[in-house]
A protein has these predicted regions:
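C-terminal subdomain of the subtilisin-like protease fold in secreted/lumenal serine endopeptidases
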Residues: 63, 70, 201-205, 373-489
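Outer membrane beta-barrel transmembrane domains
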Residues: 554-556, 561-578, 598, 614-623, ...
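Residues on the lipid-exposed face of transmembrane beta-strands in outer-membrane beta-barrel proteins
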Residues: 530-534, 586-590, 631-635, 676-682, ...
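Extracellular S/T/G-rich loop segment that most often corresponds to the catalytic His/Ser-adjacent loop
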Residues: 90, 270-369
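Subtilisin-like serine protease catalytic core
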Residues: 40-53, 62, 72-108, 115-183, ...
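C-terminal motif of bacterial Sec signal peptides marking the signal peptidase cleavage site
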Residues: 13-16
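Substrate-binding/access-modulating region of protease and related hydrolase catalytic domains
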Residues: 22-26, 80-81, 138, 142, ...
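Outer-membrane beta-barrel channels and translocator barrels
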Residues: 536-539, 592-595, 636-640, 683-687, ...
């Protein structure tokens, strides 16, 4: 296999940043045994793929840093670093450790030995094993003592072993004297090394550094010393370089003074002098379990703009297998007595606790790998790092940029939408945006579940305030716009008062009033409809408010018969003309030999469910205004068998009937529909009537320039039949049997242009879909009613059976019973 070989000169000057400043585990402590007796109840979130609690296993909780950065929230979105290559430049790796026993976890170009093919000692494998386990230790849920997993547990590690020197102890700290050495070879080779490593890695973890702070040197010194390396870091914009800030705060220098490490180390802080590096380089400081900056950790200081805080104190991590048995007496001196005693008593121990910015940096590296998978091909590395900074916790103490820089790492916020989510219906995220909150589709009963079923699990992208895409089901924006007050409407109809007056000059006046409680709780009379007719021989001219225009097809006596039998204003009328109920209609009727000709012109709005709270004749205009006309031809309305045919035209502004398409789903084109009805009434025997209607509509293609591009071939159908027997038990009682189907889409297609993410340049990508719309069920409503009318009282009983309610297939039959009685005093 091809290997990348790091030829680092002056290796003794590069020190690991774990264990208090070096690769030795002097700040490592044994892990005390813990029991997890918690039993949490899952609280599924429908906006994510899997409830986050699913990921909060004992393995997850054994590494407190995971919960501290809210890693499970990112996992719930389906991101775990899969497909992401993480470069790890570190001392050495125990690749046989339990945390790395996973197929393909190691990139084939990994280099696990030193120059000359020397095998690192178990102690030399300590630091790299620890950092790698935090980044990408495998998730296996096996009952291994102290088992844990990494932040990006599905990422692949490209490990490069380098030899690191030991960090200075108290009294030995001294910033490296850069002018005292020749750096040309180092600069040349490290530049090539990182250039090649960057070509194969999405993010590179560097838990090491020189002694000294970035502010100990001038820009000119660093520019002259590392020109090629700096240029490489700047040119590799698609790779993020993560650096440990250093562990030198509070250490004693050679002058006996305590070091105030107010700024990160040289490599971690290069972005201060070279701003172009701040876009893809990040320095990481360490915090403890309380979220406080670690005493030993360098601060962000001058690197605040590209510095972040992450867990780095007593972090659970993996160590080489059987470490104690491999240690020489000299190597044992690197451990404090507590750790050494623990390892001696647990010689096979494979986990310890470690402190250092070496272990905070891998939390950031792993988080970037998770975000890289989540936003792969959508956001560039620079954009991901910017997102990590913007979403970091900046509240309270984390607002102190001198210490915490951009704040505390928060993977939940980084993987979740920032601010209000938006839709882009054009080709760029820099074009006009539409809020997703106000983008929705409200469908009437005729659609049933047809659109939702066709959409299935189809997803689209919404974008947050930072331009990041999030995939959500299209169906989540589809809602029902079905009246919930049918029963209450019948009760109101039962209580309504009708008035009529016929003058000798041919004028007829009719009105209906309903009594409601208004918004203040007071009872008010609200006009339901009003009608003025002028009748002259075979000619009728009518003007009405609040009525379905197709009701002109009925004689006054027939209207009364239907009203008293069902208390349903929509019975046997054209269902689409309810769209102009809150409006006016003008009708003309004339006899043509043996036939009658009717013409109606109408305009109005669909009456809202709270219409009775508005003042009389108050129109709450919406964008869905409808207007049109219809022509009817029928035989004598008073004959024993009446049949008629109606043909009409209906135009609805900015929408489709009473369906509402808002925001990114907006339809701005008017809907033009042709509707037809066959209506009939037959007097079978005395006081026994058979009445019914069959209705059909066909709508023109509707086009839009947003997500819904076209709705075509829309056909709807409905029917309503009833048998009514008058004076069965009493003179003024009515027994009826009725079967009906409300309008249902029989055929339609919808064409969509769905946003499916973006590229790093902000170009929104779309997917075109054309789907049929067919409800899964067909609602059939069978009902029987009995009503009785006296001078001082009236009663009404209605029993209904509804199969496939709302045109949605179901095994259940809904049964409703209405009983109403009113007495007049």
């Amino acid at each position: 296999m091809h290997k990348i070989i790091s030829l680092i000169v002056l290796v003794i000057l590069l020190n690991g940043c774990g264990g208090g400043g070096g690769s030795s585990p002097s700040q490592l402590t044994p892990i005390p045994a813990q029991e997890n007796n918690s039993s949490e109840t899952l609280d599924p979130n429908t906006d994510i793929f899997i409830p986050k609690e699913t990921f909060e296993t004992p393995e997850y909780r054994n590494q407190w840093g995971l919960d501290f950065i809210n890693a499970s929230d990112a996992y719930s979105y389906g991101a775990s670093g899969k497909g992401v290559v993480v470069g790890v430049v570190d001392e050495a790796l125990d690749w046989g450790h339990h945390e790395f026993l996973k197929e393909n976890i190691l990139h084939p170009d990994s280099v696990l030995t030193y120059s000359g093919n020397r095998e690192p000692t178990p102690l030399e494998k300590f630091h790299g094993t620890a950092t790698s386990s935090i980044i990408a230790g495998r998730k296996d849920n096996e009952p291994v003592d102290r088992n844990m997993h990494g932040v990006a547990y599905d990422a692949q590690i490209l490990f490069i072993a380098i030899e690191l020197g030991s960090p200075p102890s108290d009294g030995e700290y001294e910033p490296i004297d850069i002018p005292a050495f020749s750096w040309e070879r180092f600069d040349e080779q490290e530049s090539k090394f990182y250039e090649e490593l960057s070509s194969k890695s999405d993010v590179i973890n560097n838990s090491f550094g020189f002694t000294g702070q970035i502010t100990d040197y001038s820009r000119e010194t660093l520019q002259n010393t590392f020109p090629k390396l700096i240029n490489t870091f700047a040119s590799q914009q698609e790779t993020i370089f993560v650096w440990s800030a250093g562990n030198y705060n509070g250490i004693t220098d050679t002058e006996g003074e305590q070091v105030n490490a107010a700024n990160p180390g040289i490599l971690a802080g290069l972005g201060y002098y070279f701003p172009e590096l701040a876009k893809n380089n990040v320095a990481v400081v360490a915090v403890d379990q309380e979220g406080e900056i670690a005493d030993f950790s360098n601060r962000c200081g001058v690197a605040a703009d590209f510095c972040i805080a992450a867990p780095g104190v007593r972090v659970p991590l993996a160590i080489p297998n059987n470490l104690f048995n491999s240690l020489s007496e000299n190597e044992k001196s690197n451990f404090n007595d507590n750790v050494l005693d623990y390892l001696e008593n647990h010689p096979t121990e494979a986990y310890l606790l470690g402190s250092g910015t070496s272990f905070s940096a891998p939390h950031v590296t792993g988080s970037i790998a998770v975000l890289k998978e989540l936003f792969r091909d959508n956001l560039s590395s620079v954009q991901i790092l910017e997102r990590l900074f913007v979403t970091a916790n900046k509240t309270g103490k984390y607002a102190d940029k001198e210490i915490y820089g951009q704040g505390l790492l928060d993977l939940k916020k980084a993987s979740s939408p920032v601010g209000s989510t938006l839709f882009y219906t054009r080709s760029s995220i820099y074009s006009e945006a539409l809020p997703s909150k106000s983008s929705n589709i409200f469908l009437t009963k005729s659609f049933g579940d047809g659109l939702k079923n066709s959409l299935g699990k189809t997803k689209l992208s919404i974008f947050d305030a930072l331009g990041a895409p999030f995939s959500v089901p299209v169906s989540s924006f589809v809602r029902s716009n079905i009246s919930s007050s049918k029963t209450m409407e019948r009760l109101f109809n039962f209580k309504e008062k009708k008035y009529g007056y016929i003058s000798s000059q041919g004028f007829e006046f009719y009105s209906s009033w309903k009594r409601f409680l208004n918004s203040t709780g007071a009872e008010v009379n609200k006009i339901d409809f009003a009608e003025i007719n002028f009748r002259r021989k075979d000619t009728l001219l009518s003007f009405a408010y609040g009525k379905n225009p197709s009701s002109n097809f009925l004689d006054t006596s027939e209207e009364l018969l239907i009203h008293q039998s069902f208390y349903d204003k929509e019975a046997f009328l054209n269902p689409w003309l309810n769209l102009v109920e809150e409006g006016y209609s003008l009708g003309f009727s004339n006899r043509l030999n043996a036939l009658y000709f009717d013409l109606n012109i109408f305009s109005g709005f669909k009456r809202s469910e709270d219409w009775f709270l508005k003042p009389n004749y108050y129109f709450q205009k919406t964008k869905n205004e409808s207007k049109g006309f219809n022509l009817s031809l029928r035989n004598n309305i008073l004959s024993k068998f009446m049949i008629g045919y109606t043909l009409g035209f209906l135009e609805t502004n900015n929408g489709l009937f009473h369906n509402r398409f808002n925001g990114a789903f907006n339809i701005i084109e008017d809907t033009k529909s042709i509707f037809s009805s066959i209506s009939f009434k037959s007097s079978l025997v005395k006081e026994l009537n058979f009445i019914g209607s069959i209705n059909y509509s066909n709508s023109s293609n509707i086009n839009s320039d947003k997500i819904i591009k076209n709705i075509s071939g829309l056909e709807e159908f409905s029917f309503d039949f009833a048998l009514i027997k008058k004076s069965l038990f009493y003179k003024n009682d009515f027994l009826s049997f009725r079967i009906k189907q409300d309008p249902r889409i029989e055929k339609a297609r919808v064409s969509l242009n769905i946003p499916k993410g973006r590229n790093p340049n902000g170009v929104v990508e779309f997917q075109s879909l054309t789907l049929p719309i067919t409800p899964s069920g067909r609602e059939i409503n069978f009902e029987t009613s009995w009503s009785f009318h006296r001078d001082n009282s009236k009663s009404f009983i209605n029993l209904s059976f509804i199969d496939d309610k709302d045109h949605i297939k179901t095994k259940d039959i809904e049964i409703n019973l209405i009983f109403a009685h009113q007495r007049f005093f």
